[in-house]
Amino acid sequence: MCQININELEAKINNSTKDEFLLELEGTINEVIKISNMKILIDTDYIKIYSQDKEKMKLNKHQIMKIEEKNEEYIISFDSMQKAKIK
């Protein structure tokens, strides 16, 4: 497992050849969301997650503590008891 930054996460997801990703939320909010043709855009305050050119979710990037990569799985840990896994 190694730590990566937001820009590396954006590049790895956007350059991936996978057709479908799972966004798994763990913590205060628990949910599994299937996303087809996932793309990520970074702006001043948010990581915006898109599926087929439609915005699905925004994650506040100022609350991110760290992003880790483990075997094509990305784990985003927030400053609360919340994690988002992208598989």
Predicted regions mapped to residue ranges:
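Structured surface patches comprising rigid loops and adjacent beta-strands/short helices at the edges
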Residues: 38-40, 54-73
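N-terminal helix-cap/turn-to-beta initiation motif at the start of protein domains
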Residues: 5-17
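Basic/aromatic-rich interaction segments and small domains that mediate binding to polyanionic partners
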Residues: 44-53
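Short, flexible N-terminal segments of the mature chain
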Residues: 32-44
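Short, surface-exposed beta-strand/loop "edge" segments at domain boundaries and coil↔beta transitions
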Residues: 28-33, 53-60, 75-87
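A short, Trp-centered hydrophobic/proline-enriched beta-strand micro-motif
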Residues: 18-26
